[in-house]
Amino acid sequence: MGNKDDDGEQQQQQQQQPRGGGGDDDDDDNENSTKTTVFLGVPITSETSAIALVYFVQGVIGLASLAKSFFLKDELHLSPSEAAVVTSISSLPWLVKPLWGFISDTVPLFGYKRKSYLCLMGVLGCLAWSTLSQGVAVVDNRWTASFLFAVGSLSIAFSDVLIDSIVVERARESEDNSTTGSLQSLCWGMVAFGGIASSYFSGELVEEKGSAFVFACTAVFPLLIAGAAFLVKEEKQDEMSSSIETTTVVNVVDGGECKEPETIPTASAEEKNGGVVEAGKETLSTLWSVVKQKQIWGPALFMYLWQATPSPGSAMFYFSTNELHFSPEFLGRVSFARSLAALGGVGLYNAYFKYVPLKKMFTYSAVLATALGSTQLLLVSGYNRELGISDELFALTDSAVLTVLGEISFLPVLVLAAKICPKGVEATLFASLMSLFNFGGVTSQFLGAGLTEKLGVTADNFDNLFELVAICNFTTLLPLVAIGFLNEVEQREEEGDDSDGEEGQKMIQA
């Protein structure tokens, strides 16, 4: 998701045009060569196969999620707050996705901007998970675990940026919006398929084989990323260069009136000496020219606050396993239900909520999240049993409902990010906004860890868990104090000025 756009059909058709003269037989051969297999409206070529593979790995890598939690709890014997810190550190590579894009764009590795990095990330991911599969014999402290989990995240985050760049390139080559949308569906479909498959088996594997075995299985998946590199069509480059083009930025003054478009040059086309430094300076200068405007940083701040409220996730995991005695297999079923519920949330949003104004959507979402999130207090207090509802049934249904609401609340964030991206810097700014959103998630985990420590919630002491969950739940309303920053976005919506958002919305892949 991130997050998490489009197609290469036109390029394929161009590649299949006759290159020379020939008779009827040649024409027949060419006619047959244009008949390709189509899946979800996307012609299956080597490059679309590479895209599908990388997105599938993004979903299936979740196989290790439950094993990771049990490894930190049962084998490293970390407290809930310590486990939350490790989880936060492992998310750091997702915070600097624009950096990975900049590196691949300006510093070709062995002559390639995409293929070589995909291979490298696949190998790094495999090594990280293989090392983790050795268990406490090698990974005997939280810092080693944090480093290895972070390397595993780096392999996915970097490859996500690489494959997204290929998707965007193919989207620009295609003038057909339907094929663009079809490739978007393929991407999301592969992530969903991988996530559902991994969540279904994750709990059972942890319970029967242990975390080390699951990590060993997970080590295989990054190799698919390395394999995908050989399916990508890319010409070898002899020199390091930057291909960031001149961009036009529309500055908006207070009151929503537009000035004349201001042309802001980015990195020059072919920098031979000091190209990386110059490209970096120009890119940062361009980005700063955009983000310093209130109609950009205001909604961006709201996005960060929306994600940054504290979470009791680690404490609830320890409560579920140590107090309620939920088995790994059952927690795997809960994860599977969440994956299905997430798809349901996407469907509900597309069917009923995508045309709701953003301010109204965020306000309703925050209020509903607070109300429905309060149901966790019933589980913590045990009151659900007095109502005749078992802990397992309550946890399963509650997780599914909250996941549906979570997806409905998350998708407007992507729409907001897309709408505030001016033309010319859509990719860079969108990636930066998603990194800021991810940073909000890390902040949430750190704040949750701090509250957990402060309230004295440990692996076997849940006396203050009720207070922890209540505090985290009601802070969900706090981002609404910044809801006014969305006024200009809604004003542009009412005026029908969605041109900036259309380009960014094609890249809704967090």
Q: How should these model regions be labeled?
A:
Residues 56, 128-129, 139-159, 387-412:
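Hydrophobic core of transmembrane alpha-helices in multi-pass small-molecule transporters
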Residues 31-94, 295-324, 331:
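Helix-loop boundary and gating motifs at the non-cytosolic
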Residues 17-44, 239-298, 503:
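Juxtamembrane intracellular "pre-TM" segments in multi-pass secondary transporters
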